[in-house]
Amino acid sequence: MIRTLTTFLTSSFLAFPATAHVVLQNMEGHAGYQEYVTIAVPHGCGASPTTQVRVKIPEGIMIVAPEQKAGWVTAIIRRKLAEPTIGEGGAKVTEVIDEVSWSNGNLPIDQLGLFTLLVRTPDTPGRVLFFKTIQKCVAGETKWVDTIPQGEPTWKMWARPAPAPFMVLKKPDAPQLGATMQQILEERSKLGSPSATR
């Protein structure tokens, strides 16, 4: 079962009433799926409101689409791959989105801010994706970048001083679209181009 933000925050505040973390709204996702990744910011830097949220995209994520957030400026930083790879539909990919930021905003310390990405997760069930996040405020910043080695129990993340928001990839029961991309491409080739069917 996917553990939601509400469940986490409830248990977190019961266990640690004086603390809260920047987390993902859903901490589990399917390997090889398009997933919404929502970073939840439940507080500021002490008594200072949040003005920027920067997220480092984990290795292996080839597709990223950040949501435009009203009142904030969304920006992306791209990174060239050491070697080109093949992406969706057989297209050659030479660079990927490395970082996404939302800035020039003002999130009060007592309000919850949600910052969303649509990503294509790697096809690696069991892997933990760490979305290292830097929360900048009017005064100061917090770097939510602490991680654990792959294979370690994820509960150990909560013992870290500033755990990075993370998602555990699980094996899906079926392809997200009901068929593999190869099957879809083969079916598409049978139908031909739109102009050929007129």
Residue ranges and their predicted role:
Residues Q34-G71:
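Low-complexity, serine/threonine/proline/glycine-rich extracellular segments that form mucin-like
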Residues M1-S11:
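Sec-dependent signal peptide recognition
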Residues V100-R127:
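Low-complexity, intrinsically disordered segments enriched in Ser/Thr together with acidic residues
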Residues K136-R198:
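Extracytoplasmic/periplasmic copper-protein system
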Residues F16-A20:
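Sec/Tat signal peptide C-region and signal peptidase I cleavage site
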Residues K80-I109:
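Extracellular adhesion/glycan-binding regions together with long Ser/Thr-
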Residues G126-A139:
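Serine/threonine-enriched low-complexity regions used as flexible
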Residues G32-V37, R127-F130:
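Short, solvent-exposed loop/turn segments enriched in Ser/Thr/Gly
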